[in-house]
Regions:
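Alpha-helical transmembrane segments of multi-pass small-molecule/ion transporters
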Residues: 1-289
Length: 289
């Protein structure tokens, strides 16, 4: 197995699995019960992540001039759930952290079923028959399940049966997961360093546009739905931050495409810049948002 294969087939899946395990350590069954106890806020957030974001991604990919593989990469990103760091940012922004955790947990599990179909349809729609990578919806579903749902379930099991151990592990695991995320994103960008100028020219502004547009639409959605300010903050952050590590995993490990990985890598850089600006805004402006 070559060095590149070791990274994409071993290190990347294991890193993503650890990140999802760290997420599971913070979850309890009550996080899933909020789907019933606070349905309106949850449904608004879930709609924003699972419907609004993919539609916005499809519109942008259809209209923005870029290579077909990059268009598919946009759709891979758009069909991923939010990243675990969204919960921490929601907490810092004085948002509804419980809602953010519930959205992250449920949408992450649901994406196992939705992501493969969106990606499969996007490959067929945007790419010519001769350039399409081999993709199996079932195999993609299994691959995503093994590196997301299984580690989350293991983390929750530790939290359930050994809560003190889980709390101690969570503090360390959260920091390790953050470091792994940074290395994965920077490593993904570095791997295309020879073509990075061309890729940034094609999708850099597009990813910024997508990120700002989705956060603005999430704000409008929260306002129109009559959500309280903390809930609106949670929905905006949950919709704006995506699981870039999962997008990179699907593109590189499951589809074997470096180009399809680029939108997820660039978006991961952009989203923390805009999230930081949003955090500064909500902390400065106690009313509104």
């Amino acid at each position: 197995m070559g060095e590149g294969n070791i990274v994409t087939q071993v290190l990347l899946p294991l890193s993503l699995a650890f990140i999802m395990f760290a997420l599971g350590l913070a979850l309890v069954v009550a996080d899933f019960k909020r789907v019933v106890t606070a349905p309106r806020a949850f449904l608004v957030g879930a709609f924003g992540q699972m419907a609004m974001f993919p539609v916005a991604g499809f519109v942008l990919a259809s209209l923005w001039p870029m290579d077909p593989a990059l268009k598919v990469g946009v759709m891979i990103l758009a069909s991923c759930p939010t990243g675990a760091t969204s919960n921490l940012l929601t907490h810092f922004a004085k948002g509804d952290t419980a809602l953010a955790i519930s959205l992250t947990a449920v949408v992450s599990i649901a994406s196992v079923f939705t992501l493969p179909f969106v990606v499969g349809a996007s490959v067929v729609h945007f790419m010519d028959a001769g350039t399409r990578p081999d993709i199996s919806v079932a195999q993609t579903m299994i691959g995503v399940f093994l590196v997301t749902n299984v580690p989350v379930a293991l983390g929750m099991a530790v939290r359930r049966w050994a809560p003190e151990t889980a709390l101690g592990m969570e503090r360390v695991a959260r920091h390790v997961a953050a470091v792994l995320f940074v290395f994965i994103v920077l490593g993904a960008v570095y791997s295309v360093r020879e073509d990075i100028r061309d890729y940034f020219a094609q999708v850099g502004l597009a990813m910024l546009t997508l990120n700002v547009a989705v956060m603005a639409l999430a704000w409008l959605l929260g306002r129109a739905s009559g959500l309280a300010r903390p809930q609106r903050i949670a929905v905006i952050i949950e919709c704006g931050l995506q699981n870039g590590t999962l997008a990179i995993f699907v593109a590189l490990t499951l589809l074997g495409s470096t180009a399809m990985m680029v939108p997820g890598g660039i978006y991961s850089l952009v989203m923390f810049a805009t999230a930081g600006l949003f955090l500064a805004l909500v902390l400065k402006t106690r009313a509104g948002v």
